[in-house]
Amino acid sequence: MYSSSMMPSGYVFKFNDAAISWCTKKQPVTALSSCEAEYIARTFATCQALWLDSVMKELKCEVIKPPTLKIDNKSAINLAKNPISHGRSKHIETRFHFIREQVTNGMIELHYCPIELQLADGFTKAVKLDRFEFLRKELGVLDVMQL
């Protein structure tokens, strides 16, 4: 049975304005808040970002250093940047603090991105037609009816 507390999460990575990696799935744990859900989702995105960074290095592509994740939840950003545990985060499984470690070590950067500009939204929730068309265009997906 699907629990609404097991939130779907997603990410998309772009290189030279083209989507090169994307994912959407239900989180493996039940998050107790939207902050926690976003934090957990960005941990998975961090793993993918670091892997893509290593692939780009291997291919000798010029990439922005360090990789940047755009997050629409300021509390999740603060949680990842603050290495001090507090009551709201002490129950989060240790494996999900990987993002915090990578931020602390300078391997990844986190930037706030308003929800209106989140490209992965189309993967995780129903969107209206105008929003869908915006996301499709930003992801570089062509409208087959206009070919």
Each language-model region and where it sits:
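Divalent metal-binding acidic/histidine catalytic loops
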Residues: 1-147
